[in-house]
UniProtKB/Swiss-Prot annotation:
It comes from the Bacteria. The keyword Metal-binding applies. It comes from Vibrio vulnificus (strain CMCP6). PANTHER family: PHOSPHORIBOSYLFORMYLGLYCINAMIDINE SYNTHASE. This is Phosphoribosylformylglycinamidine synthase. Pathway: Purine metabolism; IMP biosynthesis via de novo pathway; 5-amino-1-(5-phospho-D-ribosyl)imidazole from N(2)-formyl-N(1)-(5-phospho-D-ribosyl)glycinamide: step 1/2. One of its GO terms (molecular function) is metal ion binding. InterPro entries: Class_I_gatase-like (IPR029062), FGAR-AT_N (IPR040707), FGAR-AT_PurM_N-like (IPR055181), PurL_large (IPR010073), PurL_linker (IPR041609), PurM-like_C_dom (IPR010918), PurM-like_C_sf (IPR036676), PurM-like_N_sf (IPR036921). Mg(2+) binds at E718, N722, D886.
Length: 1297
C-alpha cells in the first residue's frame, strides 16, 4: 500500500461547524485541520513516471491553505470490508489513464485535533462521533492502519440448519440469529418441505426464502383474507385496488405485473442516435408513459443519505427494467418525519417525546436524506421535479386512545415517470439456454436482509442487523447500465434483452429466481461467476447482499455478441452467471467449495406459502372539537407559515437538478421571482412536440387519526386538484400510484387500512374513472424503544401517498400559481369543494396549537370533484385562467399568500361568503382552488363552473394590486392586514434555518436577506437580437450539414439535449463516447465541431471534469487527437458544465486558452440548481456573435462551478484579455457577487470564457437545456418555439457558412 497526501479537506466554515459541535459537547478542542489521504493498493511498485502521473491525478479540488498537521490524528476511512463509490470511480480513472499497476484507490480524511488539555478516551469517542458516520465509516489512530481497507479474507463457507434432527426449534433459532422475520406458518412450511426433500436447508436457502417471501416483497397483508368485527370480507386489499383497473382499464398497457406500470402516451419524434451510424435523429413512434413510486423508509431512518439515495436509485432501476427496457425521465421525492426542533428555532407545538439511539432524529434525516435523494438523481441525470415534506409528531386521542403519533420511522418516497416503446412494453419468453446476466456493479457485503429488516417495526431487529441493511450508492454506475439499456431498446425489434429485472430487496437471491420464474423457466447458476469485490464473503452474503446499481437480464445466445459490444463501449461491467433451464428448478453451484448451496424446486421458493388471514376490530375515535381559546389570528398565520408542511421548501429544491434532459416544461420554481409553489410537474414528450406528461402528488396523512377513509379520499382528491390546471382532457387519462404506509397490528389500524383501501378502490376511484395500476406498501410504521426502563413507542398514522400521472395534450397551457399584474382588471375566484363545511380537524392550524380536533375535511361528493376537474380542463383549454392554485395544507390563507408571493403583488380578499367563523374559513383544508381570471371573462368562467355543477360553491373573493399589502376582509371589517413581504419572510424562515445548518451559512443569510427586498423586479430579459429570427435558416436550406461530435464520458448525462440543439441549428450530430476515441473507433479529424457535454464524468471524483481531462492528457493517442483538433483552424469547440471543467483542464492543448481558470467547489458547498440571469459579454466567441449585451435567464446545475484564479494579477489578466464571455448579473442587470444571483461565488461573476480567437468557448450554465422556450422555467411572452439561447447554436452554424 502506498500513502499519498491530498489537499485540505475542509473549508473554513466546515471547520467552524465542527468546532461548534465540539463546544456544544463541552470538549476542550481548540482547532481542527483535515486533509485527504489517498491509499493505493498496487500490484507492483510504480516507476517514477507512473508515480508522478498518480500524484497529478490525486491533485484536485479548490486551493485551500495547507498547514503542517499537528494534534491528535484521527483517520476516517470507509468501513474496512466495503468499497466506497469514490474508490470505484477513482480506480476507473487511474486504469483509463494507463496506471494498470493500481489495483484500487481509496480515500480517507485525516483529522488533526488540537485541544487545550489532553482528551480523555471518552472525549475522543465523542470527537469520533462528530467527524464520522458509524454506518459507513471507521476511525483509525494512524495512517498505516488503513491497510485494513485492502485486506483480503478467505471465502467463508455456508452453514446448514439441522432440522432433520433438531426439528422446528433449530429453524426458530436460525430465524432470530439470521434476522429472517419468518412467520410461524412459514417456519412450518419450510420444515415440512425440507423434510420431504430429505435434507437440511442451507443458511443461504433460508435467507433467500425469507427475502422472497418477506412482507416487503410478497405484500402478504395486501393479499390476505380479512375478517372485520367478526364478518368475513369479500375481497383482499389488493383485489379492491385491482377493482379500479377492472372498472377503468382505459389507456393502461401494463399493470400489477412488472417493475412499473405503463399507460398510453403520445406519438412523437423520439430523439436518439441511430444504433448503426450513431447519428442523432428523430424517430416517430409512440412514447408510452411508465410510472413508479417506491418507499425507502427503514434505510433512511438508519442512515439518511444512502437510504434516500438508494431509494431513488432503486426506483430509477424499476423504470429502466420495465418491459424489455424503459427510459427513466423525471423524478419525485417526498419525506414525512417527526418534528424538526431546529436548534434555536424550536416551535411552540414541538414536544420532545424521545427516540431510540439506533435511528437518526428528524432534523438529521431532513439535513441529509434530501441531499442523498437529490445527489442520486443529479448524478444519474434525471430532473427531480416534484415532492412534498410533512412533519407530524403529537400526543393525541385517536382510535387507540391517547398516544404519541408521529414519524420516527420516516416516510422516504421516491418515484418518477419515463417512456417506453410500444413493442417493448411486454416482457418476452426466456429461451431455454439463454444467458442469465448480472449487469452493473460488484457484490459487496452491504444491505444484507434489507427486505426482511424493513418488514419489521423499528426496534425489533438487533442493531447490528440494522447496520447490515444499510446500502451504498453509485449513481454513475447506474447511468452506465442505463446507457446499455438505452442502446438495447434503441435497436427496436433487434433489442437483445429478452427479460430484465432490477436488483432490489434481497439482492440477486430475489432477482434471479424472479427472473427465471417470471420467464417460466428454471435456472442453473454459478456462485463464483457473480462479480464480487469482497472475496471473504460467505455464499449467503454473495447471493443475498443488496449491492446497488445491478440488473439481471436474460439474453439469447445469438444476441450475446451484440450485448457484449454495447457493454464494452459504455464501460458497464456484466457477467454471465447462469443459464435458463426447461425444468423449473433452481441450482446454485459453488466452484470454490465444490458444493451446491441451493438445490430446490422453484415452487418451494416461490410456490404458495400459507396465505395470511387477518382479524381486525373497528375502533371509534373520541377526539374533542378544536378549542379556539388563545388563538389570535396574526399569531396563527405566523405559526402556520412556519410549519414545515406549509413553509417554503427551497432547501429541498435547489439541491436537485431540474433542467437535465431539456424536456422540463414545469418545475417547482414559478415565475420571475422563482417561488417554489408549482402545483405539479410537466415534461415535454420530445423536442419536436408540445405533447407531454404531468405528475402531481396528494397526501393528507394526519386526517387518518380521525377518519381513515377521509384521509385516503383527500389524498386522491388533492392529487387531482394539483394536476387539474394542465391540459389533460379526459379524467381517465390520469393514472394513480398508491403508496400505503401502516403500523399494521396496532389497535384499530388494520380495520382502518381496510376502510381506507375500500374508500378509494371500491368507491371513489371507480366513481371518478381513475385507475391505480401501481403502488407499494410498507406495513411496519412504528418505532419502539426502552428509555430508562420505560417502554416507549411512536406510531405513524395510516399514510396513503397518491401520485397522479397523466398524458398532456399541450404543455404550454399549464397554469401556475403566479398572480398576474400585467393583464388588466382581474378577480380571484374560490371553488370550495367543502361546500362551506369548513371542517378544521387534523389541519395545520390544529397541529400548530397541539390539537387534533374532531371532524376533518373529506370528499363528500365524487361527482362534484369530477365536475371540478372537467371545468378546469375546459378553462385551461380556452385560455381563461391567468393563475391557479389548489387549496391544501394551511387552507385558503396559505393558497392566497403563496399566489401573492409568486406574483410579487398585493391581495385584497373578502371572505364574507364563506361564513362567520373566520378561523374556519381561512384555515380549513377542504379541497378546492383559487383561480385568477380577467374581469371581462368572469361571467364566462362562472358559467363554465355552473355548467359543471359548481355554481353554489364558487365565490368571487377579491382582486389583486401591485402593492405589498395582503388584506383580508369579512364584509366591511378588515380582519387581517399584513405586508406581503413580511409574510414571505416568515414563510422562508424554516428553509433559511435548514440551509444555514447544512450549507455555507453566509450564503444562506444572503439568500434570506434578498427575500426581504420588495423592490426586486424579478427575472427579466433584454436582447440585442430578435429571438424569433432563425439566422441559421439560409445555411440549413442549402442542405449541407456540418459534422458535430457530441462527446461524452462515463457519467455524462446532458448529451441528448445538446445534440438536439445542434441538430436544430443544422448540424449532423454524432454520439461519441470517450471509449470510441481511446479504442480508435472514432477520429476527431472528421468533425467540424466538438462539444464536451455536462453531467458527472466519473461521478466528479478527483475534481469535476478533471478525471475526464486527465484520461486525455495521460493517453498519448487521445492527447494527440484532441491537440490536432483544437489546432485546426476551421473547427470550433464548446464545453458546458462538466465539459467546461474538462476543457479548462485541457487548456495546455488549446491555443489561446492559457489564462483560463479552474472551476472548483461552489461557495455554498452545495450543488446549485438555479434559473439564473446572465449577460453576454463582448468577446470574439463564435457562439456569441451579435449577442453582446443580451441579458436572459439560463439553467444552472453544478456543484463545482466557482472560478478559481491564482491571484489578483491572474484575474486582471483574464479581464484585460477580452476572453470573458458570460457573467452572472442581478435582476437590475449588474454583475454580482450576491448569492444566489451568483450561485457559485465566482469572482467578477465570471461564468463563461472563450479563447483569444473565439473558436473555443466554455461555460458553466446550460444553454442546451433551454433552447426551446417551453423548457424555460419562466420566459417573457412573445417568444416563439425557440428560446433566446438557440441563437448560440445558430451562430455556430452561421460561422461555418
Amino acid at each position: 500500500m502506498r500513502i499519498l497526501r491530498g489537499s485540505p479537506a475542509l473549508s473554513e466554515f466546515r471547520v467552524n461547524k465542527l468546532l461548534e459541535l465540539c463546544r456544544e459537547q463541552d470538549l476542550p478542542v481548540t482547532g481542527i485541520y483535515a486533509e485527504f489521504m489517498h491509499f493505493a493498493d498496487l500490484t507492483s511498485e510504480l516507476d517514477a513516471e507512473a508515480l508522478e502521473k498518480l500524484e497529478k491525478l490525486l491533485t484536485y479540488g479548490p486551493t485551500i491553505e495547507e498547514h503542517e498537521p499537528q494534534g491528535l490524528l484521527l483517520l476516517v476511512t470507509p468501513r474496512p470490508g466495503t468499497i466506497s463509490p469514490w474508490s470505484s470511480k477513482a480506480t476507473d480513472i487511474a486504469q483509463n489513464c494507463g496506471l494498470n499497476a493500481v489495483k484500487r484507490l481509496e480515500r480517507g480524511t485525516a483529522y488533526y485535533v488540537e485541544s487545550s488539555s489532553e482528551l480523555s478516551s471518552v472525549q475522543i469517542d465523542i470527537v469520533k462521533s462528530i467527524i464520522h458516520d458509524r454506518m459507513m465509516e471507521a476511525v483509525f489512530g494512524d495512517l498505516e492502519a488503513a491497510a485494513a481497507l485492502f485486506s483480503v479474507a478467505q471465502p467463508a463457507p455456508m452453514t446448514q440448519v439441522d432440522i432433520l434432527s433438531g426439528g422446528r426449534l433449530a429453524l426458530e433459532e436460525a430465524n432470530v440469529s439470521l434476522g429472517l422475520a419468518l412467520a410461524e406458518d412459514e417456519i412450518d412450511y419450510l420444515v415440512e418441505n425440507f423434510t420431504k426433500l430429505g435434507r437440511n436447508p442451507n443458511d443461504i436457502e433460508l435467507m433467500m426464502f425469507a427475502q422472497a417471501n418477506s412482507e416487503h416483497c410478497r405484500h402478504k397483508i395486501f393479499n390476505a383474507d380479512w375478517t372485520i368485527d367478526g364478518v368475513e370480507q369479500p375481497k383482499s386489499l389488493f383485489k379492491m385496488i385491482k377493482n379500479t383497473f377492472e372498472t377503468t382499464p382505459d389507456h393502461v398497457l401494463s399493470a400489477y405485473k412488472d417493475n412499473a406500470a405503463v399507460m398510453t402516451g403520445s406519438k412523437v419524434g423520439r430523439f436518439f442516435p441511430d444504433p448503426e451510424t450513431r447519428q442523432y435523429n428523430y424517430h416517430h413512434e409512440d412514447a408510452h408513459i411508465l410510472m413508479k413510486v417506491e418507499t425507502h423508509n427503514h434505510p433512511t431512518a438508519i442512515s439518511p443519505w444512502p437510504g434516500a439515495s438508494t431509494g431513488s436509485g432503486g426506483e430509477i432501476r424499476d423504470e429502466g427494467a420495465t418491459g424489455i427496457g424503459g427510459k427513466p425521465k423525471a423524478g419525485l421525492v417526498g419525506f414525512t418525519t417527526s418534528n424538526l426542533r431546529i436548534p434555536g428555532f424550536e416551535q411552540p407545538w414541538e414536544t420532545d417525546f424521545g427516540k431510540p439511539g439506533r435511528i437518526v432524529n428528524a432534523l438529521d434525516i431532513m439535513l441529509e436524506g434530501p441531499l442523498g435523494g437529490a445527489a442520486f438523481n443529479n448524478e444519474f441525470g434525471r430532473p427531480n421535479l416534484l415532492g412534498y415534506f410533512r412533519t407530524y409528531e403529537e400526543k393525541v386521542t385517536s382510535h387507540a386512545g391517547e398516544e404519541v403519533r408521529g414519524y420516527h420511522k420516516p416516510i422516504m418516497i421516491a418515484g418518477g415517470m419515463g417512456n417506453i416503446r410500444d413493442e417493448h412494453v411486454q416482457k418476452k419468453e426466456i429461451p431455454v439456454g439463454a444467458s442469465l446476466i448480472v449487469l452493473g456493479g460488484p457484490a459487496m457485503n452491504i444491505g444484507l436482509g434489507g427486505g426482511a429488516a424493513s418488514s419489521m417495526a423499528s426496534g425489533q431487529s438487533a442493531e447490528d442487523l440494522d447496520f447490515a441493511s444499510v446500502q451504498r450508492e453509485n449513481p454513475e454506475m447506474e447511468r452506465r447500465c442505463q446507457e446499455v439499456i438505452d442502446r438495447c431498446w434503441q435497436l427496436g425489434d433487434n433489442n437483445p434483452i429478452a427479460f430484465i429485472h432490477d436488483v432490489g430487496a434481497g439482492g440477486i437471491s430475489n432477482a434471479l429466481p424472479e427472473l427465471v420464474n417470471d420467464g417460466e423457466r428454471g435456472g442453473k447458476f454459478q456462485l463464483r461467476d457473480v462479480p464480487n469485490d469482497e472475496p471473504g464473503m460467505s455464499p449467503l452474503e454473495i447471493w443475498c447482499n443488496e449491492s446497488q446499481e445491478r440488473y439481471v437480464l436474460a439474453v439469447a445466445p445469438e444476441n450475446m455478441a451484440a450485448f457484449d459490444a454495447i457493454c464494452k463501449r459504455e464501460r458497464a461491467p456484466y457477467a454471465v452467471v447462469g443459464v435458463a433451464t426447461e425444468e423449473r428448478h433452481l441450482t446454485l453451484e459453488d466452484a470454490h467449495f465444490d458444493n451446491t448451496p441451493i438445490d430446490m424446486p422453484m415452487d418451494i421458493l416461490l410456490g404458495k406459502p400459507p396465505k395470511m388471514h387477518r382479524e381486525a376490530t373497528t375502533l371509534k375515535v373520541d377526539s374533542p372539537a378544536m378549542t379556539r381559546d388563545g388563538i389570535e389570528l396574526n399569531e396563527a398565520v405566523d405559526r402556520v407559515l412556519r410549519l414545515p408542511t406549509v413553509a417554503e421548501k427551497t432547501f429541498l429544491i435547489t439541491i436537485g437538478d431540474r433542467t437535465v434532459t431539456g424536456l422540463v416544461a414545469r418545475d417547482q420554481m414559478v415565475g420571475p421571482w422563482q417561488v417554489p409553489v408549482a402545483n405539479c410537474a410537466v415534461t415535454a414528450a420530445s423536442y419536436d412536440t408540445y405533447h407531454g406528461e404531468a405528475m402531481s402528488m396528494g397526501e393528507r396523512t394526519p386526517v387518518a387519526l380521525l377518519d381513515f377513509g377521509a384521509s385516503a379520499r383527500l389524498a386522491v382528491g388533492e392529487s387531482l386538484t394539483n394536476i387539474a390546471a394542465t391540459d389533460i382532457g379526459d379524467i381517465k387519462r390520469i393514472k394513480l400510484s398508491a403508496n400505503w404506509m401502516s403500523p399494521a397490528g396496532h389497535p384499530g389500524e388494520d380495520a382502518g387500512l381496510y376502510e381506507a383501501v375500500k374508500a378509494v378502490g371500491e368507491e371513489l376511484c371507480p366513481a371518478l374513472g381513475l385507475t391505480i395500476p401501481v403502488g407499494k406498501d410498507s406495513m411496519s410504521m412504528k418505532t419502539k424503544w426502552n428509555e430508562n426502563g420505560e417502554e416507549k413507542e411512536v406510531t405513524s398514522p395510516l399514510s396513503l401517498i397518491i401520485t397522479a400521472f397523466a398524458r398532456v395534450e399541450d404543455v404550454r397551457k399549464t397554469i401556475t400559481p403566479q398572480l398576474r399584474t400585467d393583464k388588466g382588471e382581474t378577480s380571484l375566484v374560490l371553488v370550495d369543494l367543502g361546500n362551506g363545511k369548513n371542517r378544521l380537524g387534523a389541519t395545520a392550524l390544529a397541529q400548530v396549537y397541539k390539537q387534533l380536533g374532531d371532524k376533518p375535511a373529506d370528499v363528500d361528493n365524487a361527482e362534484q370533484l369530477k365536475g371540478f376537474f372537467d371545468a378546469m380542463q375546459a378553462l385551461v383549454r380556452q385560455d381563461k385562467l391567468l393563475a391557479y392554485h389548489d387549496k391544501g395544507d394551511g387552507g385558503l390563507l396559505v393558497t392566497l399568500a403563496e399566489m401573492a408571493f409568486a406574483g410579487h403583488c398585493g391581495v385584497n380578499a373578502n371572505i364574507a361568503a364563506l361564513g362567520d367563523d373566520v378561523l374556519a374559513a381561512l384555515f380549513n383544508e377542504e379541497l378546492g382552488a383559487v383561480v385568477q381570471v380577467k374581469n371581462d371573462e368572469l361571467d364566462s368562467v362562472l358559467s363554465t363552473l355552473a355548467a359543471n355543477g359548481l355554481e353554489a360553491c364558487s365565490h368571487v373573493i377579491g382582486a389583486i394590486d401591485a402593492s405589498d399589502n395582503f388584506v383580508i376582509r369579512s364584509g366591511d371589517a378588515v380582519i387581517l392586514e399584513r405586508s406581503r413581504t413580511d409574510l414571505r419572510v416568515i414563510w422562508a424562515e424554516t428553509t433559511h434555518k435548514m440551509q444555514a445548518l447544512r450549507d455555507n451559512p453566509a450564503c444562506a443569510d444572503q439568500e434570506f436577506e434578498a427575500k426581504k427586498d420588495n423592490s426586486d423586479p424579478g427575472l427579466n430579459v433584454s436582447l440585442s437580437f430578435d429571438v424569433n429570427e432563425d439566422i441559421a435558416a439560409p445555411y440549413i436550406a442549402k442542405g449541407a450539414k456540418p459534422k458535430m461530435a457530441i462527446l461524452r464520458e462515463q457519467g455524462v448525462n446532458s448529451h441528448v439535449e445538446m445534440a438536439a440543439a445542434f441538430d436544430r441549428a443544422g448540424f449532423e450530430a454524432t454520439d461519441i463516447h470517450m471509449s470510441d476515441i481511446l479504442t480508435g473507433q472514432a477520429v476527431l479529424d472528421e468533425y467540424h465541431g466538438l462539444v464536451a457535454c455536462g453531467g458527472f464524468s466519473y461521478g466528479d471524483v478527483l475534481g469535476a471534469g478533471e478525471g475526464w481531462a486527465k484520461s486525455v492528457l495521460f493517453n498519448a493517442q487521445a492527447r494527440e487527437q484532441f491537440q490536432a483538433f483544437f489546432n485546426r483552424e476551421n473547427t470550433f469547440s464548446l464545453g458546458v458544465c462538466n465539459g467546461c471543467q474538462m476543457l479548462s483542464n485541457l487548456k495546455e492543448l488549446i491555443p489561446g486558452a492559457d489564462l483560463w481558470p479552474r472551476f472548483v467547489r461552489n461557495e455554498s458547498e452545495r450543488f446549485e440548481a438555479r434559473f439564473s440571469l446572465v449577460e453576454v459579454q463582448k468577446s470574439d466567441s463564435v457562439f456569441f456573435d451579435g449577442m453582446a449585451g443580451s441579458r436572459m435567464p439560463i439553467a444552472v446545475s453544478h456543484g463545482e462551478g466557482r472560478v478559481e484564479v491564482r491571484d489578483a494579477q491572474h484575474l486582471a489578466a483574464i479581464e484585460a484579455s477580452g476572453t470573458v464571455a458570460v457573467r452572472f448579473v442581478d435582476n437590475l442587470g449588474n454583475p454580482t457577487q450576491q448569492y444566489p444571483n451568483n450561485p457559485n461565488g465566482s469572482p467578477n461573476a465570471i461564468t463563461g470564457l472563450t479563447t483569444k480567437d473565439g473558436r473555443v468557448t466554455i461555460m458553466m450554465p446550460h444553454p442546451e437545456r433551454v433552447f426551446r422556450t417551453v423548457a424555460n422555467s419562466w420566459a417573457p411572452e412573445g417568444w416563439g418555439e425557440n428560446g433566446a439561447w438557440m441563437r448560440m447554436f445558430q451562430n455556430a452554424r452561421k460561422n461555418l457558412g
